[in-house]
Amino acid sequence: MSGPNIVHSGYGLRCEKLDKPLNLGWGLDNSAVLHWPGELPTGWLCDALDQIFIAAPQLSAVVLPWSEWCEEPQALTLFGQVQSDIIHRSAFWQLPLWLSSPANRASGEMVFDAEREIYFPQRPPRPQGEVYRRYDPRIRRMLSFRIADPVSDAERFTRWMNDPRVEYFWEQSGSLEVQIAYLERQLTSKHAFPLIGCFDDRPVSNIEIYWAAEDRIGRHYSWQPFDRGLHLLVGEQQWRGAHYVQSWLRGVTHYLLLNEPRTQRTVLEPRTDNQRLFRHLEPAGYRTIKEFDFPHKRSRMVMADRHHFFTEVGL
């Protein structure tokens, strides 16, 4: 499940899967040169690059010398995607390698909502099933997100929503029937849908994804047409550690930026007294924009932008 399993070894990096050190040399501008290690297992290269960029965050790029890699199919596919044999970290992480299926695309038409008096791009259909999957070497877990299912997730979701810690911030406690109805409303919404976050395919969290323009937050800031927003909760106590929260918070931000390349910003509007969450947001790339009032709560608006996320934060 861990793929190449790149680890630190002495003064370099070692691939446990290949059972040998990686032949890495220093390049220009904080890049490294990765020499061809020989015959590779299927899917090794992209997984290895992902783990190299995590293990050596100072690297801006990895060079795969054409003369050495020109007969390696995995490298040729990657060269075609980035149009170079220099794999820049920020560009690599913006490839759709971790999307479980091709993202739905909108028609490009514009829609006017007369009730709210907003003009925005028509949204694509809601995705189905699993949407994202990536092994996180920091915590040695497979992170994935899938669309919530009112049938299979209802009992678990009800338990989460009736947890006093969750209920305090969400104010959404209630019976099984109440929670099924809530999920079904989310699944029929035109601008939002619920995801279940999983570690090693075990459900851990609920994340509501929405288009900011059509959501209530759209009345409180100058939105861009493809801004995405999210509401978050961790349902299982054993997965509330900071390292796990960083994994799925960065992961869901990554998913949103891959899902729609025109999305430049992602936003949250947690309650101002949710201090535990605020401790996790800045390391994941979210900066405070302002505080403001909803009818039911005082909120802090935080925002991550694409350039900062991929160049300064990463995965």
From Swiss-Prot:
Please give the pathway this protein is involved in: Siderophore biosynthesis; aerobactin biosynthesis
Q: Which InterPro entries match?
A: Acyl_CoA_acyltransferase, Acyltransferase_MbtK/IucB-like
**Which reactions does this protein catalyse?**
N(6)-hydroxy-L-lysine + acetyl-CoA = N(6)-acetyl-N(6)-hydroxy-L-lysine + CoA
Is this entry keyworded Acyltransferase? no
Q: What is its EC number?
A: 2.3.1.102
Q: How does activity depend on temperature?
A: Optimum temperature is 40 degrees Celsius.
Keywords in alphabetical order, please: Cell membrane, Cytoplasm, Membrane, Plasmid, Transferase
**Gene3D superfamilies per the UniProt record, alphabetical:** 3.40.630.30
Subcellular localization, as worded in the UniProt entry? Cytoplasm; Cell membrane
Its GO CC terms are: cytoplasm; plasma membrane
Q: Which EC class heads this enzyme's classification?
A: transferase
pH dependence comment: Optimum pH is 7.
A GO BP annotation: siderophore biosynthetic process
> Does Cell membrane show up as a keyword for this record?
yes
Tell me the GO molecular function terms.
N-acyltransferase activity; N6-hydroxylysine O-acetyltransferase activity
**UniProt record similarity statement:** Belongs to the IucB family.
What does the UniProt record say this protein does? Answer: Catalyzes the transfer of acetyl from acetyl-CoA to the N-hydroxylysine. Involved in the biosynthesis of the siderophore aerobactin which is a chelator that mediates the high-affinity iron transport systems induced under iron-stressed conditions.
What is this protein's name? N(6)-hydroxylysine O-acetyltransferase
Q: State the species of origin.
A: Escherichia coli
